[in-house]
Amino acid sequence: MKIVILGPAHPYRGGLASIMETMAREYQRRGDEVKVYTFSLQYPSLLFPGKSQTVDAPAPHDLHIERVMNTCNPLNWIALGHRLRKEAPDMILMKYWTPFMAPCFGTIARIARKNGKTKVICQIDNVEPHEHHLIDKPFNRYYLGAVDGFVYMSEQVGGELRAYASAPAIFSPHPMFEHFGQRLERSEACSKLGLDASKRYLLFFGLIRDYKGLDILLEAFEKVADDGVRLLVAGEFYNDKEQYRALLERLGNRVVLHDHFIPDAEVASYFSVADALVLPYRTATQSGVTQIAYNFSVPMVVTRVGGLPEIVPDGKVGFVCEPTVEGVRQAIEQLYEEGTLQRFAENFPEERKRFSWGTMCDKLVEVFNQAK
């Protein structure tokens, strides 16, 4: 099959780019012809709260990646749509996570599929964004109405999708992020991160935004009595750091703050020092961070929002709690009850079987075959 993947890829950073590149490799492994078309401009700097959108690492040698898509240039969308219409791949595989992408993606898809051969298939992260705007619904309608089939990764997203599109849609959970490698020896990981190996660490990992509830976790952790446990916060602030200052000052050295983007080469170290990952989210669909934890067999505390309880069954590899200070506090204290972390560790091999890239790519082909 001839496949063009449209979305984030090198040199763009983060989990979305990793997902697209991993799927490209899986389809290449199966013998498909795969090209990846990524952005020449993803976000204008005014709309990007981080420090950099790209990485300095060399491009992967095993993938065909072209930077051809400008989200702010309608003439570019039209030209790329006509290029794809002429190239006539069997499948255009797109990832959708924010309505900001809808005008660009929707225009390209609508033009490309007019050749009567190409089907547009979407792996969809979110329908309704975490931060809402008036343009969200019309933008969603424009893009989602141009897609021939979907794979969604939480039942919440599947339900939201039905309000916009009648095309075939299949559930498949977010696969594990395996490209981060294996767990390191804890002492080695502590040394690499400059951490005191005599302490134990809970991990909050990823971009820091209001809906992720870091303030809930900080308040909950303040109430946890065990002074031998530290909270390791690793990620770049995408909102105002000042709103956390009072909490951070009260907690003092009980919180270790690494407030910068964590490059792929360092991810294994953070998960190798952690007793558990805590996701105190106020809202969620699913989270790619849980799939990093699965890769490293790190137990989790997640809140009962969106698709998180689907990914982390309560009492098997972690705890599901209410998105409140008291709920998170109780779950953290339960983690350190005798035998709990060991029991969770023993359950990981069976739970990990649900999250393969092969299954995800199979589901995308399945919905491609169902699409008209």
Feature map (PLM): residue ranges:
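Conserved donor-binding/catalytic core segment of Leloir-type glycosyltransferases
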Residues: L195-K212, L218-F221, L232
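Donor nucleotide-sugar binding/catalytic pocket of nucleotide-sugar-dependent glycosyltransferases
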Residues: G145-L184
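N-terminal strand-loop element at the rim of the active site
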Residues: A9-R13, R25-K86, V157, F237-D240
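Acidic donor-binding loop of glycosyltransferase active sites
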Residues: S269-T285, V298
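Conserved acidic donor-binding segment of nucleotide-sugar-dependent glycosyltransferases
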Residues: D314-E326, I332-G339
